[in-house]
A protein has these predicted regions:
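Positively charged n-region of N-terminal signal peptides that target proteins for export
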Residues: 1-5
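Bacterial N-terminal signal peptides
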Residues: 6-20
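Extracytoplasmic copper-binding redox domains, predominantly the cupredoxin/blue-copper superfamily
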Residues: 25-241
Length: 241
């Protein structure tokens, strides 16, 4: 091969490489952390109050035993349910897209299920009426658009909340005993304690955070915690009347 031919071959190779799309190099994902814990109730648990649903026989017949209020629900081992736990400080400068999966608020037995719902701002909320009777769902926000919608059985209803707000009281204008709460966040780092008081904040970026626990009757508590990359830590809150 002559020098001229060799130069032509090298030029052709370089030209073909220059026409290739650039290779994208992805940096390895940062190891995330988790924060698990439990919320406890100190002292003798308050007795739940029986709900009188006699004004709507369709509501009353949905329960084999009398329905009770859910403002303070204490489970096994004094675990406190329906507490919202969330990152209230430490995420400055970060933005998060809402999940594609909608949150679901069900009206069942003429009560809101779950009693306390948490979702992300601009995440779709599917409101479901599983009862034979007609409901009127009416959130009363301070930082979001108020809406007040009559919903017969089976009629689909989709809503969203645009801004963070903890927490929005929800009532039903038809059934005055129906009460619940919706907590709206601008990030995905929140949880609602289960029937045993347990919660799990997953996939936290490493950092130092203020963690807040909110309960509708017992108020709020805060703690500060630092988690490293890939680290798992535990946290406990205790409420009392």
């Amino acid at each position: 091969m002559t020098v001229k031919c060799a130069l032509i071959s090298v030029f052709a190779l370089l030209l073909s490489l220059s026409n290739r799309p650039p290779m994208l190099w992805a940096s390895p994902p940062e190891a995330t952390s988790s924060l698990k814990g439990v919320v406890k109730f100190e002292g003798a648990p308050p007795k739940p109050t029986r709900i009188d649903m006699s004004q709507d026989p369709l509501c009353a017949k949905a329960h084999s035993t009398p329905a009770t209020t859910e403002d303070v629900v204490v489970g096994a081992g004094s675990g406190l349910a329906n507490v919202v736990i969330y990152v209230s400080d430490g995420l400055a400068g970060k933005t998060f897209e809402p999940p594609q999966q909608p949150a679901v608020l069900e009206q069942k037995g003429c009560q809101y299920k779950p009693h306390v719902l948490a979702l992300q701002a601009k995440q779709k909320l599917d409101v479901v009426n599983s009862d034979e009777t007609t409901h009127n769902i009416h959130p009363g926000p301070n930082n979001n658009r108020e809406w007040n919608v009559t919903q017969p059985h089976g009629l689909p209803l989709e809503q969203t909340f645009a801004r963070e707000e903890i927490a929005i009281p929800v009532k039903c204008n038809v059934h005055p005993w129906m009460k619940g709460y919706i907590a709206v966040f601008k990030h995905p780092y929140f949880a609602v304690s289960d029937k045993n008081g347990s919660f799990d904040l997953k996939d936290l970026p490493p950092g130092t955070y203020t963690i807040t626990a909110w309960q509708e009757k017992l108020g709020t508590q805060t703690q500060q915690i630092t988690v490293g990359a890939g680290e798992s830590k535990t946290l406990a809150f205790t409420f009392k009347q």
